A protein has these predicted regions:
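Conserved nucleotide-binding/hydrolysis modules and their immediate coupling elements
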Residues: 1-51, 89
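A common structural junction motif
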Residues: 38-44, 72-77, 107-116, 225, ...
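Short glycine-/aliphatic-rich beta-strand segments at the starts of folded cytosolic domains
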Residues: 45-59, 162-167, 243-253
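Short glycine/threonine-rich beta-strand-turn micro-motifs
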Residues: 84-99, 203-211
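Glycine- and Gly-Pro-enriched alpha-helical subdomains that act as flexible
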Residues: 207-246, 250, 255, 259-261
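C-terminal accessory nucleic-acid interaction domains of nucleic acid-metabolism proteins
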Residues: 275-369
Length: 369
């Protein structure tokens, strides 16, 4: 149904031509930039948030805050809302402090929620630098599934790409489709600090099902464990990499302050070039280092400096070892994303450590050596 509104009244229309505005009811899973019909999704319209802020309800009902933020999330592609049941914590992922101020005011004016937010944290991501075959086996009593996934480094900014190169003789098409569907629907996280996994090509190489015992959900378990098992193997081989967001900046300060500015950028692990004609510095720097630098510039230039920032994607984390060391994430304790497999013997299922899966797998490995 296509609706054309006039104030609060509307009429049904059979078609909409270019330039007209209409409403389509009962769309539950649409999102900003989604292509409808034959149009492809517009990925360019969605900038990825780079900072995370924890919400302080200040006495407001936390569930009411969650409902309001979820509604705003549907309206703004730059806003992501994350609810942690374990921590009883509500976080918003944004582009920066200006968007945060606007959000805070909207919550107050539109929903009468007078909340505050804690200091922003950088949103890291994880990726891989080597190719690996991850294996997941799920075989409690009266269940069976095994999945082999080839994980390869993807192009920067490509996200997660899924495909199948598995023979129909090895695994029925329905099972293959189920595996790919499960992989696409899950938010995969890394094993370094539990940050989202990105820029990885994941290909279903082979697998095994049981006519008698494989039921719905078994390959969801096996495929998820396969990804995690592959990541744990790469961690052991130092084949993982932590990524962080970087700013592209343009900094203009008085000539006598150029030395200070260049020294600051170097201290931030940034790179820059100097336009001698205008005295302008331009370059790249980590968001974690430069997110609060605008205030510093205003202070040491007495308001005469100008800093322009734009997010320029994710790059190698400049202090990876420090970030990983400061993280309390333990991939083996993350039961919702376990790398362990489950095998069956004597009528009972038992857990097998990720490192022992290669010698226990029922299907032969596709990658040799």
């Amino acid at each position: 149904e296509l609706r054309v509104y006039d104030a609060k009244r509307y009429g049904a229309a059979k078609e909409i031509v270019a330039g007209q505005i209409c409403a389509i009811p009962n769309l539950n899973e649409t999102f900003v930039g989604q292509g409808l019909g034959f149009l492809e999704n517009d990925a360019s319209s969605c900038m990825t948030p780079v900072l995370s802020y924890a919400l302080n309800p200040n006495g407001c009902d936390l569930h009411a805050c969650l409902v309001a933020l979820k509604e705003l999330e549907d309206e703004d592609e730059h806003l992501h809302v994350v609810w942690s049941k374990q921590l009883n914590e509500l976080r918003v992922q944004l582009m920066g402090p200006i968007q945060l101020e606007v959000l805070q005011q909207i919550l107050k004016d539109r929903y009468e929620l007078d909340v505050s937010f804690e200091q922003g944290r950088t949103l890291y991501k994880e990726t891989i630098t080597q190719t690996i075959e991850g294996v997941g086996h799920f075989e409690p009593l009266r269940h069976y599934a095994e999945a082999h996934l080839i994980m390869e480094p993807g192009k920067p900014g490509s996200g997660l790409v899924f495909s199948s190169d598995c023979s129909l003789e090895e695994l029925d098409k329905n099972w293959q489709n189920q595996i790919l569907s499960c992989l696409k629907s899950k938010e995969h996280i890394g094993v370094l600090i539990g940050a989202p996994l990105t820029d990885v090509k994941i290909t279903l190489a082979t697998g095994r099902a049981s006519i008698k015992h494989t039921v719905g959900g078994d390959f969801r378990q096996a495929s998820g464990r396969a990804v995690r098992q592959g990541l744990m193997m790469l961690k052991e081989r130092q084949g993982l990499k932590l990524l962080e967001p970087w700013y592209r900046f343009v900094l203009k300060v008085p000539e006598e302050k150029l030395g200070r500015a260049m020294n600051d950028i170097q201290q931030m692990s940034g790179t820059f070039s100097l336009d001698q004609a205008t005295g302008t510095l331009s370059g790249l720097a980590p968001v974690s280092e430069m997110q609060s630098y605008a205030e510093t510039v205003r202070t040491y230039t007495r308001g005469k400096g100008l800093l322009e920032l734009s997010v320029d994607g994710y790059r190698q984390c400049h202090n990876e070892q420090e970030v990983v060391s400061n993280s309390s994430y333990d991939p083996l304790s993350d039961l919702e994303n376990t790398p362990q497999s489950v095998f069956c013997a004597h009528g009972a299922g038992y857990t097998v450590d990720w490192s022992d899966v290669p010698k226990m797998a029922h299907e032969e490995y596709v990658l040799k050596g």
